[in-house]
């Protein structure tokens, strides 16, 4: 019994001790768990602080970026606003100047009207004075002569009319002279303004081009066997080729600037290539002609763009470029037309006209000169017909006619073109009359030869002392060539005046070409 009790007590004591030990262990684990939880909480809190800090930095950077963009945009808007404000201020200033000018004109008009009213008042007073005198004279006449009042009135009125007419004529002449002087003063001022705002360049056109040659061997190859190459060059190119003892130089002479420029380019390419023979000459000539056509169009487009013009037909643009190879009285036609365009624009603007339209009329006023080598007629008629065909502005057509006196100028722009044309032509050194007379004679010489049937082309060479005529071998035989030369010589002798004699050289060449396949 006692043993059982002792065992029970021991069991109870063991359970108590086990409970205490277990509780102690659990308490220790709990404390460890709590510490771990606290550590994790601190780690999470630290990580959250880092995330929050990064978020704040991102928000701050975003705010700075937005602020920077806002400031840049605000600065740009402010700059645009300032620019527009400046432009508006300039326009407002210009408007104020125009208003002041209108005000001055209005004041001048009011003064003129007042002056006219004063004159009218003076005239009325004179009329009253003459009427009083007339009444007195009528009474005297009635008593002294026994004339009726109507008869006396006729005598007096006739006398008064003669006296009044003299006085009125004197007044009219006075104000007409004042108006002319004022108009002349304003015209001189406008011309001075135009010429001071434009500074053009001028270089007189020559009749020769000099081509540099490396050595005399190349000269011999250009001449060819028995002069075959140089003859082919002169016949194909229509120029004079002068090869003398001058070292390192060949001279190309021709009054036609376009032919001379093409000839110079062809010879330069042949010298560079080294293959100089008739077939190669014709091949290079055809190639250069195509290149010049493209270059002429580009030149015209550049000029139209520089002048700020638009909607000009491509054919007219090409002819503008072709003016570069035309000359009048030694003055390059393109340089002259550009000068007229700029001056006409300035003059028209000063007179209250359309500056762009005046420039357009100025560049086209001599456009017919680009056609005179290919068509019959004056450059005025050719240019006007061309502009009518391509529906140019009526002011342009009127300017073409008016600048040579074929029509009266009907607008400010046309009058500006006429004035600019006169200014450009009258400038000292701008033109050479003697050279132009020579060029005209040489051109007439070619025209006479080309007017005959069966003629392919004609070139005046040797300073107009020889005309080389290329006949169509299929239309003209050998016998007809002789007659053709005599006819041309007779017509030249009949229609032209020239010193010495002119040689007429008719060339008939038949070529047969076939290809072996």
UniProtKB/Swiss-Prot annotation:
GO biological process terms, semicolon-separated: mRNA catabolic process
Name of the top EC class for this enzyme: hydrolase
Gene3D superfamilies (alphabetical): Hypothetical protein af1432, K Homology domain, type 1
Matching Pfam families: HD (PF01966), RNase_Y_N (PF12072)
Domain of life assignment: Bacteria
Location of the HD domain: 333-426
Compartments, as annotated in UniProt: Cell membrane
CDD domains with a match to the protein in the record: HDc, KH-I_RNaseY
Enzyme Commission no: 3.1.-.-
Segments traversing the membrane: 1-21
SUPFAM superfamilies (UniProt xref): Eukaryotic type KH-domain (KH-domain type I), HD-domain/PDEase-like
Single GO cellular component term: plasma membrane
Primary location group: membrane
Keywords linked to the UniProt accession: Cell membrane, Endonuclease, Hydrolase, Membrane, Nuclease, RNA-binding, Transmembrane, Transmembrane helix
UniProt KW DNA-binding keyword: no
UniProt xrefs under InterPro entries: HD/PDEase_dom, HD_domain, HDIG_dom, KH_dom_type_1_sf, Ribonuclease_Y, RNase_Y_N
Signal peptide: none
Membrane topology: Single-pass membrane protein
Location of the KH domain: 207-273
NCBIfam families reported in the protein's UniProt record: HDIG, RNase_Y
Function: Endoribonuclease that initiates mRNA decay.
HAMAP family: RNase_Y
Protein name per Swiss-Prot or TrEMBL: Ribonuclease Y
């Amino acid at each position: 019994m006692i043993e059982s009790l002792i065992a029970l007590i021991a069991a109870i004591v063991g359970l108590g001790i086990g409970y205490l030990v277990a509780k102690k262990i659990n308490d220790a684990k709990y404390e460890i768990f709590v510490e771990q939880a606290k550590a994790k909480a601190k780690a999470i809190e630290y990580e959250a602080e880092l995330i929050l800090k990064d978020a704040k930095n991102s928000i701050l950077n975003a705010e700075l970026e937005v602020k920077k963009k806002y400031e840049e945009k605000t600065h740009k808007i402010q700059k645009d606003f300032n620019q527009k404000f400046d432009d508006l201020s300039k326009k407002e200033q210009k408007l104020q100047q125009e208003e002041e000018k209108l005000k001055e004109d209005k004041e001048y008009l009011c003064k003129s009207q007042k002056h006219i009213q004063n004159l009218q008042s003076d005239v009325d007073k004179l009329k009253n004075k003459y009427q009083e005198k007339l009444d007195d004279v009528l009474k005297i006449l009635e008593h002294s002569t026994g004339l009726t009042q109507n008869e006396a009135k006729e005598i007096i009125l006739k006398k008064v009319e003669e006296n009044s007419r003299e006085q009125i004529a004197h007044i009219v002449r006075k104000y007409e002279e004042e108006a002319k002087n004022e108009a002349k003063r304003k015209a001189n001022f406008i011309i001075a303004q135009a010429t001071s705002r434009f500074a053009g360049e001028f270089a007189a056109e020559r009749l020769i081009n000099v081509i540099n040659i490396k050595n005399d061997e190349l000269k011999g190859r250009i001449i060819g066997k028995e002069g075959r190459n140089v003859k082919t060059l002169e016949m194909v190119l229509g120029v004079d080729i002068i090869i003398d003892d001058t070292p390192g130089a060949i001279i190309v002479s021709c009054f036609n600037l376009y032919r001379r420029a093409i000839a110079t380019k062809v010879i330069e390419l042949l010298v560079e290539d080294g293959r100089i023979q008739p077939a190669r000459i014709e091949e290079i000539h055809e190639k250069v002609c195509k290149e010049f056509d493209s270059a002429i169009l580009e030149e015209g487009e550049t000029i139209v763009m520089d002048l700020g013009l638009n909607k000009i037909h491509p054919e007219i643009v090409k002819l503008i470029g072709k003016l570069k190879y035309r000359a009048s009285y030694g003055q390059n036609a393109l340089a002259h037309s550009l000068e007229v365009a700029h001056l006409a624009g300035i003059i028209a603007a000063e007179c209250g006209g359309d500056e762009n339209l005046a420039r357009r009329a100025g560049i086209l006023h001599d456009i017919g000169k680009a056609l005179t080598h290919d068509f019959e007629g004056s450059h005025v008629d050719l240019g006007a017909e061309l502009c009518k065909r391509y529906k140019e502005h009526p002011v342009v057509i009127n300017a073409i006619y008016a600048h040579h006196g074929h029509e009266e100028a009907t607008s400010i722009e046309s009058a500006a073109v006429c004035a600019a044309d006169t200014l450009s032509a009258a400038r000292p050194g701008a033109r050479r009359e003697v050279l132009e007379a020579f060029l005209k004679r040489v051109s007439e010489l070619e025209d006479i030869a080309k007017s005959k049937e069966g003629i392919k082309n004609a070139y005046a060479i040797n300073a107009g002392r020889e005309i080389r005529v290329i006949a169509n071998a299929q239309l003209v035989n050998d016998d007809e060539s002789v007659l053709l030369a005599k006819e041309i010589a007779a017509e030249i002798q009949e229609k032209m005046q020239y010193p010495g004699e002119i040689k007429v050289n008719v060339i008939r060449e038949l070529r047969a070409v076939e290809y072996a396949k």
